[in-house]
Amino acid sequence: MGLEVTGIDHLYVSVSDLSRSIAFYDPVMRLLGFRKGTDPIAGEPHVHYYNRETQFSLRPSKRPGAHDPYSAGLHHLCFRVGSATDVDTAARELRALGVDAVEPRLYPEYAPDYYATFFSDPDGLRLELVALRRMRTLVREHWGELTEFENPVRKAGLV
């Protein structure tokens, strides 16, 4: 079957307090280049943030409870940006907004060029910004040559 997923169309996050989450996400998503919409769905308020490729939406949770990244479900959400400089700039601007973003750095335990910052939303959902990694570029450029995905770039002799 020749079907290929070309991206993630949308991601919905249930939040415990929609107003509090809007106060957090409005400036964060604006900083990341997203635009806001507020179309309700089935009579319930929803907030949608769009960029060229993806929709990120907030909806009120139906049951109380704190986010637990180690229970079944979403562990964290990572947004990719163009460069380490972009990560540095975004982390600095997030901190200026009052967001507790960790100092960006390399995380070689993930990949040799994994440069990121981390922060959390009001419900404890861990968010991340990572610089475009060489492996992602190589996978995209050499997709047709790659057949194994345990260290695909190394196995194909591209690094």
Positions of predicted regions on the chain:
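Core segments of cupin and vicinal oxygen chelate
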Residues: 12-57
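Vicinal oxygen chelate
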Residues: 15-20, 78-123
